[in-house]
From Swiss-Prot:
PANTHER family: TELOMERE REPEAT-BINDING FACTOR 2-INTERACTING PROTEIN 1, TELOMERIC REPEAT-BINDING FACTOR 2-INTERACTING PROTEIN 1. The gene is terf2ip. Residues 1-91 form the BRCT domain. It comes from Xenopus tropicalis. A motif (Nuclear localization signal) lies at residues 493-509. This is Telomeric repeat-binding factor 2-interacting protein 1. Acts both as a regulator of telomere function and as a transcription regulator. Involved in the regulation of telomere length and protection as a component of the shelterin complex (telosome). Does not bind DNA directly: recruited to telomeric double-stranded 5'-TTAGGG-3' repeats via its interaction with terf2. Independently of its function in telomeres, also acts as a transcription regulator: recruited to extratelomeric 5'-TTAGGG-3' sites via its association with terf2 or other factors, and regulates gene expression.
Length: 509
């Protein structure tokens, strides 16, 4: 940099005749930092990445090939302040050594360096010329005589032709590759392939498709001649949930996607449809109207009941135990009454439809079966449990939330033995107020002490049982239910035989 005299070369050194700047590319590094000011000062451009038309500069020995140009090209052009021939500096594999320009060859080449030519053809030509000169003049030229310029010109011209041929061949190969790349286009899915994919998914895996096993099976069985990735992408992007195709009917109609034609034929809403495929799609308007009225009445009856039950659940949190128990009982009675009303209305709708349409007895019989099936399957969800709850079911475990335990206390209040439930509630409320604990904490303490109120109160006061034995834990309860003699012996040693017997009876109650 210092030898260059502070960048004294021309500002248009690396500018073409038409005024466009020459483009160069050098990999990032110290060499790029060194050449960047030289190129930009001469009017050239330094590309950040490889671009078509840019000269790829490389240090001698680092890269080889006709597409690379030695960095000595930039240094020589800046030193002479003249744009030299690029082909003389291309790295064509001669161990990374650049070719020198014609001017440097004229200055440094001597007669004794003719034998050291890199090409064998040039050596043979020069030897033939030297032999011809000897035969004519019978003497050798002195070392101080000038070199024949015609021979040097012929050698340089042959090298230029070879380099141009190499570059042209490389360009042809690159153009052919790019043409092949542009010619290859993705095959579009046909309608037949889409239908085959949808049929296979419907018949083999109607509820499965998130994994890769289904799509790999389709690729192995060659349902369509595509990769499993392409099949999966096609299904989830363009086929799933869209009604572009009408698939043929099969036996498994539950997994079939509904088409536009099928939507025009309304059918009764049932959880398990047992209507055969031979049922006609056309119905009389009277039957359809009755069915619609029946379904609307069902939803109107069930809607308020569910809203009231939700409101009751939210209000139960801030009410006392007795009021919550009464509200739960009233809500269950209201739900059962609403259920009975809906059942009666359904029966009336079915009987009315059967009277009006006696000619279509077979079709109406099918609708009656479907409606009754709908009632039988839905009514058990709203039934009030009639069995009584014991203390074990009153508290399910140590991790039970307080809201669930409060609901179970309300259900205990509706058991047949009202005196015992009232006494239990009073004892729970008294311990809650005395020790300032929640209902969940008190019931858990009661469960750990086999349901004994005195032992539970002593445990809440002192933190231990009156007899000095430890408190029962859930792991020991699970071990106690196993028929293992060693485990039973260990529990007897830990809790005592009397406590183990009481615990077995308590868990069995």
């Amino acid at each position: 940099m210092a030898a260059l005299g502070g960048l004294t070369h021309s500002r248009t050194l690396f500018v073409d005749d038409d005024g466009t700047p020459m483009s160069f590319y050098v990999p990032p590094g110290p060499l790029k930092r060194q050449l960047y000011p030289l190129i930009t000062h001469g009017g050239g451009e330094m590309c950040r990445m490889q671009q078509p038309g840019a000269l790829l500069l490389s240090a001698p020995g680092s890269a080889q090939g006709a597409q690379y140009v030695s960095t000595a090209y930039i240094m020589d052009c800046v030193r002479i302040d003249k744009l030299l021939d690029v082909d003389d500096y291309r790295l064509d594999g001669s161990h990374g050594r650049p070719r020198k320009s014609q001017g440097s060859k004229k200055e440094e080449r001597a007669p004794q360096q003719k034998v050291g030519e890199s090409s064998q053809e040039s050596d043979q030509k020069q030897q033939a010329k030297v032999g011809g000169d000897l035969e004519e003049g019978d003497k050798l030229s002195d070392p101080g005589e000038p070199v024949n310029e015609e021979s040097l010109g012929s050698v340089s011209s042959t090298r230029k032709k070879e380099n141009k041929m190499d570059c042209s061949e490389a360009q042809k190969i690159g153009s052919l590759k790019s043409a092949r790349i542009h010619q290859t286009r993705r095959n579009v899915f046909t309608e037949k392939e889409d239908v085959a994919i949808m049929l296979y998914v419907r018949e083999n895996a109607p509820h499965r498709g998130t994994g890769v096993s289904l799509w790999k099976e389709m690729e192995q069985k060659q349902v369509v001649k595509r990769t499993w990735q392409a099949i999966k992408n096609r299904y989830f992007r363009y086929l799933k949930g869209k009604r572009n195709y009408v698939l043929p009917l099969t036996d498994d109609s539950s997994s079939q996607e509904p088409s536009d034609d099928e939507e025009e034929c309304p059918q009764p809403i049932t959880k398990k449809s047992r209507i055969s495929d031979s049922t006609p799609c056309t119905e009389k308007p009277g039957v359809a109207e009755k069915t619609g009225e029946k379904l609307s009445t069902d939803t109107s009856v069930e809607g308020p009941s569910t809203e009231k039950s939700d409101a009751a659940k939210t209000s139960n949190v801030n009410l006392p135990v007795e009021e919550r128990g009464q509200e739960v009982t009233e809500g269950a009675i209201k739900r059962s009454e609403g259920n009975k009303k809906s059942t009666e209305m359904n029966e009336e709708a079915v009987s009315a439809s059967s009277k009006e349409n006696q000619d279509d007895g077979a079709d109406l019989h099918i609708f009656e079966i479907a409606n009754l099936e709908f009632e039988v399957e839905d009514t058990p969800e709203l039934e009030v449990p009639k069995r009584s709850f014991g203390l074990k079911e009153f508290v399910m475990g140590e991790d039970l939330p307080s809201s669930q335990s409060q609901t179970q206390v309300d259900e205990v209040s509706s058991s047949p033995d009202a005196s015992e439930s009232e006494g239990l509630q009073e004892a729970l409320l008294s311990m809650m107020s005395e020790f300032k604990l929640s209902l969940c904490d008190v019931t858990q303490a009661l469960l750990k002490n086999n349901g004994e109120l005195a032992a539970t109160r002593h445990f809440l006061q002192t933190g231990s049982r009156p007899d000095g034995y430890p408190i029962w834990v859930r792991k020991d309860d699970l071990d106690l239910q196993k028929d293992d003699a060693e485990t039973l012996k260990r529990l007897i040693q830990k809790y005592g035989a009397d406590n183990v017997a009481k615990r077995v009876a308590f868990l069995a109650s």
